[in-house]
Regions:
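FAD-binding core/adjacent interface of flavoenzyme oxidoreductases
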Residues: 1-3, 74-162
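Beta1-alpha1 glycine-rich phosphate/pyrophosphate-binding loop at the start
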Residues: 1-75, 82, 161-162, 171-176
Length: 176
């Protein structure tokens, strides 16, 4: 039996799992396992809406079971990957180990502050659902403080926000 392990249920991981699930649908000699730390897919391109308070967090979470409902060949596993042993062809999760013959790494990327001074210490990233909720809470807190601030300069400072980055995420966040 050939075992294919896909690490990460973002756009690339889901796309790979669906394609492989369809390709090997009737092949009993192929096992496909999709491992992700969450039982849901986060619609990353909509995180700005959560951060801006336009939608609730659940609106950008998609249950992996629903996504793969008709892809019976794909086994979904919720686990956090902590290592990969190339010699033994094993993905090590916090809960289990997963042997593979073929491995697809689709964990996504990470936010980059490009070395801009002060961003890492004072800023937020918009790279996860939890981060979007932290940004929303921060904005609400600043607005609540500004509402009761009599000093115009302090009030303006509380209501001033800087977005570092003019990529898709940054531009969408400014639009919120």
């Amino acid at each position: 039996m050939k075992e294919i392990v896909i690490v990460g249920a973002g756009y690339a991981g889901i796309s790979a799992a669906r394609k492989l699930g369809k390709t090997f649908k009737n092949d009993a000699d192929v096992k496909i396992t999709l491992v992700d730390k969450h039982a849901y897919h986060t619609y990353m391109t909509e995180l700005h809406e959560v951060a801006g308070g336009r939608v609730e967090a659940n609106a950008v979470k998609y249950d992996l079971q629903r996504i793969f409902n008709k892809y019976k060949k794909v086994q979904l596993v919720t686990d956090t990957v902590v290592g990969i042993d190339e010699a033994t062809k094993t993905v090590q999760g916090e809960s289990y180990s997963y042997h593979y013959d073929y491995l697809i790494l689709a964990m996504g990327g990470e936010a980059n502050d490009f070395g801009v001074a002060g961003v890492k210490e004072n800023g937020f990233t918009l790279w996860s659902l939890a981060a979007a909720e932290r940004i929303r809470a921060h904005i609400k807190e600043c607005c609540a403080k500004a509402e009761h601030e009599p000093n115009q300069a302090k009030r303006r400072a509380l209501l001033s926000f800087i977005v570092c980055g003019a990529g898709f995420t940054g531009v969408e966040m400014v639009g919120e």
